[in-house]
């Protein structure tokens, strides 16, 4: 939005604000300062005005410094409408974080200004787009007294985080009861030494890796496509169809006789996910102004290219196991499903606290690790 402004244009954003507790406004200030610094502006505070009334603050940002005439008009309107001016080029904020963030003249200074023990006020990026999650994981281990100053916004974040942790626990319990217990009751199949362990590792890798690609990309493309519903629909459609196509094409691969596929396929997936990791950002920037249909087609092409070989892994793994015994196949189905369910929740947590790129790196690691059990299982 800032890039689209004329030199004398104005961007206005309003968020919740509380003078007694830190809130989303602090992160908004951090984002505005980062945007101004990226434009080569050395004094962000001269390009920003922050006003508030009751529990809402409004930030005004301009590519050019506010003139005396602009500031006179803002002060007159603020007095008439009973707004409090929290920051302007004429008046520094009394709140340390707001004051220091707008006084930063480098990214390093901004990072230092936004440090907090429990809250994350760093500017949200495309790789970490969770603007409203301002709680650090360290806050989960803190006492209520330590968190008392953080206010209702952080309190809501804390409740949401506990809900995510509860979801992880329920997913683990559900997977154990529905998949784990029946498999344990069926007994461990008799297999040559190391085959069963390699099988568990193989299907755990593809179950985890698949979800570590799917879940983060839904979030990454939500803004690009304009709505989370579009991202979910397009991502699920493209990945499921492409993975199904890959599963069908896997019949043409003689993995039992040609051991090279156990190396070539995982490496191909690693390269394609790495391409998404490196190129999705530049592609989004270059095509963000295209129509919705064009953007959907770009996402489908980008995702399907990696999903086709990803879809080959499951049927090829089953075929590798049939060389030893059909009795172990239910175990492999179960492990794949269990890790997929757990990884879908874990991917959200990783993306929130470490970034979408970290989730993709986990996926890359899973498919790279896949080489080990695949080679061991290939006769």
Short names for language-model regions:
Residues 1-379:
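Alpha-helical transmembrane segments of multi-pass membrane proteins
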């Amino acid at each position: 939005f800032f890039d689209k402004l004329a030199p004398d244009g104005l961007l206005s954003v309003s968020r919740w604000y509380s003078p007694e507790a830190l809130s989303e406004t602090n992160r908004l200030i951090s984002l505005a300062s980062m945007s101004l610094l990226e434009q080569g502006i050395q004094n962000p505070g001269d390009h920003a005005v922050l006003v508030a009334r009751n529990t809402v603050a409004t930030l005004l940002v301009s590519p050019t410094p506010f003139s005396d005439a602009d500031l006179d008009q803002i002060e007159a309107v603020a007095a008439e409408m009973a707004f409090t001016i929290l920051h302007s080029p004429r008046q520094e904020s009394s709140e340390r974080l707001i004051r220091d963030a707008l006084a930063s003249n480098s990214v390093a200074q901004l990072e230092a200004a936004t440090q907090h023990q429990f809250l994350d006020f760093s500017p949200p990026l495309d790789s970490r787009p969770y603007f409203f999650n301002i709680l650090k994981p360290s806050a989960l281990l803190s006492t209520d007294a330590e968190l008392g100053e953080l206010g209702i916004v952080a309190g809501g974040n804390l409740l949401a985080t506990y809900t995510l942790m509860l979801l992880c626990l329920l997913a683990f319990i559900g997977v154990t009861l529905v998949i784990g217990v029946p498999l344990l009751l069926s007994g461990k199949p008799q297999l040559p030494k190391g085959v069963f362990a390699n099988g568990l590792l193989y299907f755990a890798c593809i179950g985890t890796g698949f979800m570590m690609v799917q879940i983060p990309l839904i979030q990454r493309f939500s803004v690009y496509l304009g709505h989370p519903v579009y991202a979910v629909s397009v991502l699920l459609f493209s990945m499921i169809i492409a993975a199904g196509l890959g599963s069908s094409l896997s019949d043409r691969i003689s993995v039992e006789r040609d051991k090279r596929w156990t190396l070539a396929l995982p490496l191909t997936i690693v390269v394609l996910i790495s391409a998404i990791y490196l190129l999705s950002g530049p592609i989004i920037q270059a095509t963000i102004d295209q129509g919705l249909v064009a953007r959907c087609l770009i996402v489908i092409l980008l995702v399907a290219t990696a999903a086709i070989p990803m879809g080959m892994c499951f049927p090829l793994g089953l075929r590798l196991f049939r060389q030893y015994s059909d009795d172990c196949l239910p175990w492999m189905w179960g492990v794949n499903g269990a890790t997929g369910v757990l990884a879908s929740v874990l991917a959200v947590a990783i993306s929130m606290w470490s970034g979408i790129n970290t989730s993709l790196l986990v996926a890359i690691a899973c498919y790279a690790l896949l080489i080990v059990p695949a080679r061991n299982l290939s006769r």
